Swiss-Prot record:
Subunit structure: Identified in the spliceosome C complex. Component of the mRNA splicing-dependent exon junction complex (EJC), which contains at least casc3, eif4a3, magoh, nxf1 and rbm8a. Forms homooligomers.
Single GO MF descriptor: mRNA binding
Protein role: Required for pre-mRNA splicing as component of the spliceosome. Core component of the splicing-dependent multiprotein exon junction complex (EJC) deposited at splice junctions on mRNAs. The EJC is a dynamic structure consisting of core proteins and several peripheral nuclear and cytoplasmic associated factors that join the complex only transiently either during EJC assembly or during subsequent mRNA metabolism.
Name under which the protein is recorded: Protein CASC3
Gene Ontology biological-process entries: mRNA splicing, via spliceosome; mRNA transport; nuclear-transcribed mRNA catabolic process, nonsense-mediated decay; regulation of translation
Location of the protein in the cell: Cytoplasm; Cytoplasm, Perinuclear region; Nucleus; Nucleus speckle
Domain of life where this protein originates: Eukaryota
Region spans: Disordered: 1-419, 646-686
Transmembrane segments: none
Family according to the record: Belongs to the CASC3 family.
Biased composition (Acidic residues): 15-25
Ranges of biased composition (kind: Basic residues): 1-10
Compositional bias per record (Basic and acidic residues), positions renumbered to this chain: 40-61, 87-102, 174-191, 199-224, 233-243, 319-328, 354-366, 392-401, 671-686
Length: 686
């Protein structure tokens, strides 16, 4: 501030001197006007001389303000504000440099043209002085005119231009040259002539650098066509561009494949729609007949598609062959699909393979002896009937199965119908798969069961026990695997239908079986508690070994008087029948021979639980010695009945109770919260 005061004093002194000179000049001009022109000229020259020295002095001061002599001037005054004054002067210089050259040129023109007119020149000089002072601080003088110019200059200084203002924006220097804030014209900010400058030299350029400046210009249409074959910028003719796109064939080809897949899958879809076996079943059956392979049904994949209305327990070979033929019968498309070759079985689970192999051996044997041709026509009819009215299917299936059963070699081949019905393949693939002629097959199954009970006791003990009796879904024959109830709901529906064959069922099975059925109705034991052997009493008792016997539902479910009583423990579904225990009248409860096997019986299978009371050993026939040669054997099929080793199966229920107990463990934490709620309620009530 001290500098500014000093400068103001100096400026005020200069301006006062100037004004005095101007006044004297004006007086001389006025006096000379009365005398002659020569005096006027002399005085004007004198006035010029007098006016010039102060103007020169003034210019020198302005120059010092512009920075030529300013450093020296400022260096004379060492003050705290010096650092601030210099940048403000720089900012103001930046703003008013352009005005000063214009003013200088105007001054020269004025000097050349109006030198003779002293009157004009003096005000000009004054104007130039005031204009030049605008480039300074704007505080050069205390005169009212100077004050006006100061106000103007202060108005022109924006907040961002006044360095004392915190909003000041520095615009000088390379760092700020691109700062566009507050600038209307880019030209003011960006240096001119910058763009053409090259940022690198071509001399040290890498050889593989493909960038050429001359190639950066937009290409002409001819060049584009020569390079790309068409004008890539023209969107007017998309047809011309399309053939060059490689995408189009890609789009079309997958669609064709999809169409082919759809065509191939049509027969399967119709098969589903017709309500017949689910699509996977045809696949497994198709593959089965030619290759005689049992589709691995042991993978207990519950694929939700149990078709409840149909219980088909055909032997695998029969079922597969007949389904194969039925497909052909049922429309050209189906025949076509079957001719194309059996599709690979869909669900092939590695776990099932060992079992499948054994079954495959058995069923190959079964397939050879059974002559399919005589059965096929009957089966076709039954198949169509099954589609329309499922109830009648059983009859045709029965006749077919009877013929096949008689022809099959008794021991390993549970009559092919039995093998097929339990062939895990249909079960495995979809547990509704063994559905085709279900009811009809059951009567045939009954007859076959009787034959098997009587004739097939000479069965090879070495045969794997995986061939299950007919009415029992395959999962039952896996000794360890809990049976998958593929058809529980279906059995509930079919309970009434199956009863139609109760008379047939009782033909093969001697009266004791019927008696035991009637007893079953009255005695129901919780299978979890009493799962034990049930023994048929009477002629067939010898053929039916005691241990953990599962009686196919044809034996018992179809009994007209029987109604399922839900046993809470095993009834995973309401259609599951608890294990009834049949006791001959007058006998005290027989003693339990083996620990009760635990496997909830599928609806088709009656699991007869062991009563907790002991069986008298004499009351029941001893179990055949060959039945349990190995305690570890999973299951044995004897006389068409699958026997499970209760020793092994008793282990199965053990894991599940721990699971149940473990669930409460997870539930245990909440009780404190309940206590809290109780406490809160008590507090609220109180």
């Amino acid at each position: 501030m001290a500098d500014r005061r000093r400068r103001r004093r100096r400026a005020s002194q200069d301006s006062e001197g100037e004004e005095e000179e101007e006044e004297s000049g004006s007086d001389s001009v006025g006096s000379g006007g009365e005398s002659g022109a020569p005096v006027r000229q002399e005085r004007s020259e004198q006035g010029n001389r007098k006016a010039e020295p102060p103007r020169e002095g003034k210019e020198s001061e302005c120059e010092s303000e512009d920075g030529i002599e300013g450093d020296a001037v400022l260096s004379d005054y060492e003050s705290a504000d010096e650092s601030e004054i210099v940048p403000t002067k720089e900012v103001e210089e930046a703003h008013y440099n352009e005005e000063e050259p214009l003013k200088a040129t105007l001054k020269q023109e004025n000097n050349v043209e109006e030198a003779p007119a002293a009157r004009d020149q003096k005000p000009k000089s004054k104007g130039t002085v005031t204009g030049e002072r605008q480039s300074g601080d704007g505080q050069e003088s205390n005169e009212p005119e100077e004050d006006k110019t100061i106000q103007k200059s202060q108005k022109q200084l924006d907040d961002d231009e006044d360095r004392k203002n915190p909003a000041y924006i520095p615009r000088k220097g390379l760092f700020f040259e691109h700062d566009l804030r507050g600038h209307v014209n880019d030209e003011e900010v960006r240096p001119k002539g910058r763009h053409p400058r090259k940022l690198w030299k071509d001399e040290g350029r890498w050889v593989h650098d493909r960038f050429h400046e001359d190639e950066q210009a937009p290409k002409s249409r001819e060049e584009l066509i020569s390079i790309y074959g068409y004008d890539i910028r023209s969107s007017k003719n998309p047809e011309e561009i399309r053939p060059r796109r490689p995408r189009k064939p890609r789009f079309s080809s997958p669609s064709r494949r999809e169409e082919n897949n759809e065509k191939a899958s049509w027969p399967l879809n119709r098969y589903q729609d017709s309500g017949d076996a689910q699509p996977l079943r045809p696949y497994t059956n198709r593959s089965a007949p030619p290759s005689n392979k049992v589709v691995p049904s042991r993978t207990y994949s519950r694929q939700g598609g149990y078709k409840e209305n149909r219980a088909s327990y055909q032997s695998e070979e029969e079922a597969s062959l007949h389904t194969y033929e039925r497909r052909q019968v049922y429309g050209g498309h189906r025949a076509r699909s079957s001719e194309q070759g059996p599709p690979p079985p869909r669900e092939f689970s590695p776990e099932a393979d060992p079992i499948v192999k054994e079954e495959a051996v058995i069923e190959k044997q079964a397939a050879e002896p059974s002559p399919p041709p005589p059965d096929r026509p009957v089966e076709k009819k039954s198949y169509s009937r099954a589609r329309r009215s499922r109830i009648k299917v059983g009859d045709t299936g029965k006749s077919m199965e009877d013929t096949t059963a008689a022809e099959l070699p008794p021991p390993p081949l549970m009559p092919p119908a039995v093998a097929a019905e339990f062939t895990p393949a249909p079960l495995n693939v979809k547990q509704g798969n063994w559905e085709p002629p279900a009811e009809g097959g059951m009567s045939g199954i009954d007859e076959e069961l009787s034959q098997m009970n009587l004739t097939e006791q000479s069965w090879n003990q070495g045969q794997p026990a995986y061939i299950s009796p007919r009415g029992i879904p395959n999962p039952m024959h896996m000794g360890n695997g809990p049976p998958q109830y593929s058809r529980m709901e279906g059995m509930a529906v079919q309970g009434g239908r199956v009863k139609r064959y109760s008379s047939q069922r009782q033909r093969p099975v001697p009266d004791p079986a019927a008696m035991h059925i009637s007893l079953m109705e009255s005695h129901y034991y919780d299978p979890l508690q009493f799962q034990g052997p049930i023994y048929t009493h009477g002629d067939s008792s010898s053929s039916m070994p005691p241990q953990g016997m599962i009686v196919p539902p044809e034996m018992h479910l179809s009994h007209p008087g029987m109604h399922p009583h839900p046993s809470p423990a095993t009834m995973s579904t309401p259609n599951l029948y608890p294990a009834p225990v049949s006791l001959p009248p007058g006998q005290q409860p027989p003693q339990q021979l083996l620990p009760p096997p635990y496997f909830p019986a599928p609806p088709n299978v009656m699991n007869f639980g062991n009563p907790t009371y002991p069986y008298p050993p004499g009351a029941l026939p001893p179990p055949p010695a060959h039945l349990y040669p190995n305690a570890q054997a999973q299951s044995q099929v004897y006389g068409g009945v699958t026997y499970y080793n209760p020793v092994q199966q008793q282990v199965q229920p053990k894991p599940s109770p721990p699971r149940r107990t473990s669930q409460p463990v997870t539930i245990k934490p909440p009780p404190p919260e309940e206590n809290r709620h109780l406490k809160m309620n008590e507090k609220i009530n109180s």
